[in-house]
Amino acid sequence: EFPLTPTTKTSEDSFMKSHGRAVQPFVPDAKVIFDPTGKAKTSLEEIGKYTINMYRESPYITDANTSMPELELGSAHKLKKFCPTIHKLMHHMLGNGNEEFERFINWLAFIYQTKEKAQTAWVLTGIQGTGKGLFYTEILKPLFGDQHVPMRTLENLEEKFNIYMRSAMFLVLDEFHMGSSKERKLADKLKNIITERTVVVRAMHNNQIEQKSYTNVIVLTNKVDAVSLEQTDRRYNVAPRQEHKLIDVHPEIIDELSNISKELLNFAGVLNNFKYQERLVKTVFQNQAKETMRNLAMEMSEQFAMHILTGNLEYFIDILDIETNNI
C-alpha cells in the first residue's frame, strides 16, 4: 500500500506515469482522517466532500468468533479453554500475576470494543525471552492491524517527527528506559501520549496537524527501573517482573506457537463479548510491582524526601550509625 500524504498535481502526474497509468485531467481533493470507532467512514460519493478513513479492520476483528462466552473481570482466566497458547504466553509475560492478567484483559477488551483511548498504560518487564516480543508480533499486531500497532524505541520518541502516531491504536515502546533519555521532558511527552485526547502529528516536509488521538501505550522492557513513577501516579500499570524464560517454564511452547493464529479468532471473540469495567480501565492498579519500580527509579534526593514525608525513620538508621570522626 502507498501512504496517504498531501501532494501536488505535478507530483500526481509523475506518479501515474511512473506506474504506466494515464494522467488524469482532474484529481478531486479529499480529507484524510483516522477514526477506528466507525463514526466517520470513507466517502467518495460527492466531489468536494471526499473523506478517506485510514483505519483498516483486521481480518481477525472482522471474522471474530462472537459465539465465545461472556467473560468478565474475575473470569478472564477462563479464556484458557478457548485460547490455551495465547493464555499461556500472556500469563507468563505478565509475571504470572493472576489479578494483573484479569486487569490486562479488561483493559484490552475496552480498547477492542470502543476503539478509544484508555488513558492508562501498561509496563511489561522481565528478562529476555519471556514472551514480550511474541505478544507484540503474534497477538497484538495481527489482531489490531500492522499499521495501527507501531513499535518504537526511546530514540524514536525523542525525535521531532512522529508520523507513525497518525494511525496508531497502540504505541509499543521496546527496550524502554526513561532514565537513559537525553530529553528532560520525556516523562511529560509520554504522559501526553497516554492521556491527551489530541495529538500533534509532524511529518517531514509537511505542516503539522492536530487530530484526535486513539493511541494506547504498552512499554516492553528488561529494565527494573524502566519508568519514573510519581508517588501519586495515575497513568501506569506495572505487571510483576518475569525472571524466567518462557521456553524454560513451558518448553512445549515451541511446538504450540503455530496455534496462536488459529486461536486469534476465539481471542477476538472473547474481547468482543467481555463485560469490561471502565472504571478499572481508567484507574491504575497499585501493586507491589509498581511500588518496586517506583523505588528503583527514584533518584537519591527523591528517596530522601519521600522517607521524610512518610515518616520512615528506619531509612536513616544507617546514617545515624556513621562514626563522625570518619567523615
Description of each model-found segment:
Residues 186-209:
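Conserved catalytic/switch belt of AAA+ P-loop NTPases
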Residues 42-176, 184-187, 237, 271:
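P-loop NTPase catalytic core of nucleic-acid-dependent motor ATPases
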Residues 175-177, 197, 224:
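Conserved Walker B
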Residues 167-169, 213-216, 231-236:
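Short glycine-/polar-rich loops that comprise or flank the Walker A/P-loop
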Residues 128, 278-327:
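DNA transaction DNA-binding modules
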Residues 161-166, 202-220:
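AAA+/SF3 P-loop NTPase mechanochemical coupling elements
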Residues 227-246:
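A short helix-turn-beta junction within AAA+ P-loop NTPase domains corresponding to the substrate/partner-engaging
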Residues 1-74:
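Intein modules and their embedded homing endonuclease domains
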